[in-house]
């Protein structure tokens, strides 16, 4: 490895395939006669064989700044082993500057390395920082960046109340929301997680309440009621997800269908469970994500 004092110039390559070797890069940059090529790697933890894995980046050194200009121009965006690689001038990391940014070019001209110290050390020092900052930009050819998950759509007229004490009734809910003319009240229960079947806080249910929002918006209703207690307890309210309202309405429709066949009496609705009748049998072989608890009230 040549020393820093030899005035060599370096490029940084990222988004490399793990199967790319230093020889592959030497051949790729062959006509520009690279002085040296390095693909940093790390040891896989808990590997008995002491296996190494590359970081997906590399460094290549050339003799003149004109060479690195030509290399960047010709190979930035080049496809190598089904990956579109990025090639750019290397900018040395300064550990004494905590606010160091890869976009700053102070004290660095045309990718030239700083004087002093060995070239090997200069190459290895910035590996960790550049890898951590840039790793999320690795994209294979033909692979599209995933769109961020869309936020669930909120209902404009229905409030969700989670983990209400199990003794709550539709009458107490009607009284609590009486100023906003509740038209539908759905009470349903979440299934207890299998990993933690013990319940030391008592029985809880969830509630959906459809309100009249022609005069007052739902967020304002929630704000107005937040300081009030129901059955001596504060409750947590928020706009319901439309998807949850649809699940409950679907479960209700199924329960009404069963009532017409004489099997829908005393319908119980648990989330993640199928509706059951009073005999404990599955009311319908359906994978509905919500099953009804007790009370469905048309106010």
UniProtKB/Swiss-Prot annotation:
Matches recorded under Pfam families: RRM_1
Q: Does the keyword Cell membrane apply?
A: no
Q: Cross-referenced Gene3D superfamilies, in alphabetical order?
A: 3.30.70.330
Q: Which CDD domains match?
A: RRM1_RRT5 (cd12409), RRM2_RRT5 (cd12410)
User: Got a GO cellular component term for this one?
Assistant: ribonucleoprotein complex
The molecular function GO annotations come to: mRNA binding
Among PROSITE patterns, the record links this protein to: RRM
Q: Which UniProt keywords apply?
A: RNA-binding, Transcription, Transcription regulation
**Residues of the RRM domain:** 9-92
Enumerate the residue ranges of region (Disordered).
262-299
Coiled coil regions in record: none
InterPro entries, alphabetized: Nucleotide-bd_a/b_plait_sf, RBD_domain_sf, RRM_dom, Rrt5_RRM1, Rrt5_RRM2, RRT5_SRSF_SR
Question: Per the similarity annotation, which family is this?
Answer: Belongs to the RRT5 family.
Describe the function of this protein: May be involved in the modulation of rDNA transcription.
**This protein's name:** Regulator of rDNA transcription protein 5
Recorded source organism is Candida dubliniensis (strain CD36 / ATCC MYA-646 / CBS 7987 / NCPF 3949 / NRRL Y-17841)
Taxonomic classification, please?
A: Eukaryota, Fungi, Dikarya, Ascomycota, Saccharomycotina
């Amino acid at each position: 490895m040549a020393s820093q004092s030899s005035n060599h110039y370096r490029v940084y390559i990222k988004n490399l395939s793990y199967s790319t070797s230093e020889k592959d890069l030497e051949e790729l940059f062959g006509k520009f006669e690279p002085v040296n090529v390095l693909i940093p790697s790390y040891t896989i933890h808990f590997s008995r064989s002491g296996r190494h894995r590359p970081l997906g980046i590399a460094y290549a050194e050339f003799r003149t700044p004109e060479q690195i200009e030509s290399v960047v121009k010709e190979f930035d965006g080049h496809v190598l082993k089904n990956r579109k690689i990025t090639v750019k001038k290397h900018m040395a990391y300064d550990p004494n500057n905590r606010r160091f940014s890869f976009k700053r070019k102070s004290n660095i001209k045309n990718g030239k390395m700083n004087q002093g110290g060995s070239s090997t050390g200069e190459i290895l020092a910035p590996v960790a920082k550049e890898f951590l900052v840039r790793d999320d930009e690795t994209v294979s050819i033909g692979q599209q960046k995933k769109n961020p998950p869309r936020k669930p759509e909120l209902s404009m007229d229905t409030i969700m109340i989670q983990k209400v004490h199990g003794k709550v009734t539709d009458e107490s809910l009607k009284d609590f929301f009486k100023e906003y003319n509740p038209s539908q009240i759905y009470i349903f229960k979440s299934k207890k997680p299998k990993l933690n079947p013990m319940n030391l806080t008592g029985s809880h249910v969830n509630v959906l309440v459809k309100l009249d929002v022609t005069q007052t918006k739902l967020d304002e209703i929630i704000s107005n009621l937040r300081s009030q207690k129901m059955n001596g307890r504060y409750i947590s309210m928020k706009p319901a997800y439309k998807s949850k309202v649809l699940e409950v309405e679907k479960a209700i429709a199924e329960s009404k269908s069963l009532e017409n066949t004489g099997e829908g009496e005393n319908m119980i609705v648990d989330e993640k469970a199928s509706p059951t009748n009073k005999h404990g049998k599955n009311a319908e072989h359906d994978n509905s994500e919500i099953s009804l608890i007790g009370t469905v009230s048309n106010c």
